[in-house]
Every structure is written in structure tokens, then in C-alpha cells.
């Protein structure tokens, strides 16, 4: 299934963490989308994608509408997407994706965790070569659909030929070039796919083996980072736990 499949499979269920934190992070994404393209989903592709993700994460409709309304009434222009990267314990690369209105606070918070766990926060871009930046779309599967044909249609947007299928949820997830986000979303919607949720992710291109004890320490570091409201997602190049470890 390729180098990234086991990582994606292992991280899918823990993509957003606890529900309350999930809604906070999605609310911030709604605010950014509204600020950039307005409050009407039909005229704002980015907002449509976020709302579809909200629905998939079981965010109540009232919460979504309130987040849009709040975004219209406050200044969200100071929110910035910032990434922080470095090495955690045992030489594992750690990539922290944030949305913040105070970079001084955020970098101090992130650095404190790296220091606490004996890691080293590097400069922006220093570990970018270890991760592939991708846009990711999840949508409802159509009965009798031909995935090979769909992937072929999207080849100009550098969509990977590998995809994830969740039979229980009846969804397909594809990965492509971040620069082609809007074009991929438009194509999927024009093809009649429902609940097209869009996002961005970082996938490690070289997974590092760790012992169960090392994994426990690294998991604690990731959990500590995810406690900060500014942190959207934490990525590592730690190899997923085997079934024996679990």
C-alpha cells in the first residue's frame, strides 16, 4: 500500500483528538475561511470543505452556524498559520501545525514542550524534507464508482494513485498537491460527490522505528503539545505501533 499508508491508517482515528478540542480547532478554521471568502458556503469553497469536515466529525449544526456568525463579528485577520518543527526524544522528527493570533506565545509554548522532553526546536523549514505536504479530501463513495477512472481524471492535479477507503463510513479519501486544492474540490463537486471535506496534512516520507518505551514518551510529548489551543495538529515520523505493541 506504499510508505505512507500505515501511517495514515494509524493516525486517522486520532486525527482530531478529544471532541471539545476538535470543535475548537474546527471553529478556528471556519473563522479563517469566512474571513478569506465570506460567510456563504455556496460562494466560499474553502468554507464548504471545512463545513463538510465539521459534519463528518459530528459537530452540531448550531455550533457551525455560531462559528460562522462569530467570525463575521470579530477581527480574525491576525490569525496566522505557523509551523514549528524539530527533533523530539530518540531522534524522532516532530512537526507542529498551528493557527495563532500571537506567535510569541505559541513558539514559547511549543519550545517549552520540546525542552521538557529533551528535544530541540529547529528553524522553520529545517525538517520539511522529511514530510510531504498534501491536500486531503474525504467524500461519500458512489455505488459502482470506478476509482481508477477518477484518479486518472485528477492526474493533472498530482493526486496520488493510492487512496484510503473506509467501508464502515462509506467514504473515500484522496491526497493531492496542496496548490491544486480548489481545482480538486471543484472537480469532485462537479462529479456529484457528496460531503466533500477538504483539509491539509503532512505525511512523513521515512518512518522511524522506536521501542514501546520510546513510543510512550513520544506519545506523551504529542499529547502535551495538543493541549495548546493554538495547535491544530502534531505530526511525527514515528512508525505506527504494531498490533503486538497495542
UniProtKB/Swiss-Prot annotation:
| UniProt subcellular location | Cytoplasm
UniProt entry tagged with the keyword Cytoplasm: yes
Name its species: Phocaeicola vulgatus (strain ATCC 8482 / DSM 1447 / JCM 5826 / CCUG 4940 / NBRC 14291 / NCTC 11154) (Bacteroides vulgatus)
Q: Which Pfam families match?
A: TACO1_YebC_N, Transcrip_reg
What InterPro entries does the annotation carry?
Integrase-like_N (IPR017856), TACO1_YebC-like_2nd/3rd_dom (IPR048300), TACO1_YebC_N (IPR049083), Transcrip_reg_TACO1-like (IPR002876), Transcrip_reg_TACO1-like_dom3 (IPR026564), YebC-like (IPR029072)
Q: What is its main location?
A: cytoplasm
HAMAP family the UniProt entry points to: Transcrip_reg_TACO1
Question: Would I find Ribosomal protein among this entry's keywords?
Answer: no
Per the UniProt entry, what is one GO biological process? Answer: regulation of DNA-templated transcription
Q: Which family does it belong to?
A: Belongs to the TACO1 family.
Q: Which GO terms describe its cellular component?
A: cytosol
Protein name in UniProt? Probable transcriptional regulatory protein BVU_3469
Sorted UniProt keywords:
Cytoplasm, DNA-binding, Transcription, Transcription regulation
